[in-house]
């Protein structure tokens, strides 16, 4: 008699995805971040659900409802901080996951990669709208500045911004719709994750060498289930240390001041995980140019499969490309730092140089490095 997990229509799907899935025997810990993102998503949906039970999306009560959650709701403080810092962990895992894909050439799985880019945009939109909900100073001004960028679109810009705001400024209508979208988007993300996995399981996982591992597969369970559980435990440990010892480390003190349209904070900046894109936006003096650079800084990922010139898939045996990859990582860290600094010398120049370097590395230097490496190997 066939095992029920192999015959039952529902269990069969679970079995083929998480138990009997053939996986390469040599995938390293960099492959853990996909499952960690799943853990983050589930945790964010659960903590978010409990927060939504007590939150009110009204400009007069939003700020005090968050304070009420922290003070009066049973374990409300830990739910709130798990949700806020969980977003930071989500983005750390996301960026490492994308970086892993870049380093090991996983972007040659085109469908999986493109769904991943859509996922990245959706998660960024969700996080942005979530940041607006506590209705602190940075929530309000962040929402005003970022939505206002759409006014740079020729002809329809101003109308579009007012349509998104639901009025002539960021107000009650904006907060209510942001809450509605912030609630629904994680479920859309979950559906996209299923599509992402569907495409991945059509081809099977990549591995550090970048060559086919068809002749050397092992079952996902117990080998990678145990490995993923260890990763998840480490993630939860780091998150709990952050939440229990310094929950406000990654936040902005300005967000503990209720939103005031009459008082602009001295430095308007988004959460730390958007600072690299914010730095690219600010490095261009023209509004429309800045907005285009901002969008392209993420959308450029879609061009990477077309810019792959090397005859090897992975960077594992390509030292020049490896050097450029780590320069790119350092450049993104520099941009993150610049995004949090005021717009004054020398930060303006550093931001502009780092922005030019970012696009140059991806569009010119890395493809050229691939060609040079082919020549060195006489391919």
From Swiss-Prot:
Cofactor: binding comment: Binds 2 heme b groups non-covalently.
Chain ranges passing through the membrane: 33-53, 77-98, 113-133, 178-198, 226-246, 288-308, 320-340, 347-367
GO MF: metal ion binding; ubiquinol-cytochrome-c reductase activity
Pfam families per record: Cytochrom_B_C, Cytochrome_B
Gene Ontology cellular component terms for the protein in this record: mitochondrial inner membrane; respiratory chain complex III
PROSITE patterns, sorted: CYTB_CTER, CYTB_NTER
Keyword Transit peptide among UniProt keywords: no
Membrane topology: Multi-pass membrane protein
Keywords, alphabetical: Electron transport, Heme, Iron, Membrane, Metal-binding, Mitochondrion, Mitochondrion inner membrane, Respiratory chain, Transmembrane, Transmembrane helix, Transport, Ubiquinone
Signal sequence residues: none
Binding residues for heme b b566: 97, 196
Binding-site list for a ubiquinone: 201
Domain of life according to the entry: Eukaryota
GO biological process: mitochondrial electron transport, ubiquinol to cytochrome c
Known function: Component of the ubiquinol-cytochrome c reductase complex (complex III or cytochrome b-c1 complex) that is part of the mitochondrial respiratory chain. The b-c1 complex mediates electron transfer from ubiquinol to cytochrome c. Contributes to the generation of a proton gradient across the mitochondrial membrane that is then used for ATP synthesis.
Subunit record text: The cytochrome bc1 complex contains 11 subunits: 3 respiratory subunits (MT-CYB, CYC1 and UQCRFS1), 2 core proteins (UQCRC1 and UQCRC2) and 6 low-molecular weight proteins (UQCRH/QCR6, UQCRB/QCR7, UQCRQ/QCR8, UQCR10/QCR9, UQCR11/QCR10 and a cleavage product of UQCRFS1). This cytochrome bc1 complex then forms a dimer.
Family label: Belongs to the cytochrome b family.
Further remark: Heme 1 (or BL or b562) is low-potential and absorbs at about 562 nm, and heme 2 (or BH or b566) is high-potential and absorbs at about 566 nm.
Protein name: Cytochrome b
Native organism: Camelus bactrianus (Bactrian camel)
Lineage: Eukaryota, Metazoa, Chordata, Craniata, Vertebrata
């Amino acid at each position: 008699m066939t095992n029920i997990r192999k015959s039952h229509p529902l269990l069969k799907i679970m079995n083929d995805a998480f138990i009997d899935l053939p996986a390469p025997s040599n995938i390293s810990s960099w492959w853990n971040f996909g499952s960690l993102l799943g853990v983050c998503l589930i945790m964010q949906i659960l903590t978010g659900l409990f927060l939504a039970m007590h939150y009110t999306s009204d400009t007069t009560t939003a700020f005090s409802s968050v304070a009420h959650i922290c003070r009066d709701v049973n374990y409300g403080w830990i739910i709130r901080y798990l949700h806020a810092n969980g977003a930071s962990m989500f983005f750390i895992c996301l960026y490492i996951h994308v970086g892993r894909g870049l380093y090991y050439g996983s972007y040659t799985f085109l469908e999986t990669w493109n769904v991943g880019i859509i996922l990245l945009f959706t998660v960024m939109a969700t996080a942005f709208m979530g940041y607006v909900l506590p209705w602190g100073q940075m929530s309000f001004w962040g929402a005003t500045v970022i939505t206002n960028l759409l006014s740079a679109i020729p002809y329809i810009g101003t109308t579009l911004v007012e349509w998104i705001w639901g009025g002539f400024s960021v107000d009650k209508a904006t907060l209510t719709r942001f809450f509605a979208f912030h609630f629904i988007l994680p479920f859309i993300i979950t559906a996209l994750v299923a599509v992402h996995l569907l495409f991945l399981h059509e081809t099977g996982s990549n591995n550090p060498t970048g060559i086919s591992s068809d002749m050397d597969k092992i079952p996902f369970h117990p080998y990678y289930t145990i490995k993923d559980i260890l990763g998840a435990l480490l993630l939860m440990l780091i998150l709990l240390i952050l939440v229990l010892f310094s929950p406000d480390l990654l936040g902005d003190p300005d967000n503990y001041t209720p939103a005031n349209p009459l008082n602009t904070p001295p430095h308007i900046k988004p959460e730390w995980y958007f600072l690299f894109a914010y730095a690219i936006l600010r490095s261009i003096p023209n509004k429309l140019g800045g907005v285009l650079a901002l969008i392209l800084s993420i959308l450029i990922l879609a061009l990477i499969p077309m810019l792959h010139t090397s005859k090897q898939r992975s960077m594992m045996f390509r030292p020049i490309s490896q050097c450029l990859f780590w320069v790119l990582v350092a450049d993104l860290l520099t941009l993150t730092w610049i995004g949090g600094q005021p717009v004054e010398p020398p930060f303006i120049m550093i931001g502009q140089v780092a922005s030019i370097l970012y696009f140059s590395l991806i569009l010119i230097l890395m493809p050229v490095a691939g060609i040079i490496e082919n020549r060195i190997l006489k391919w």
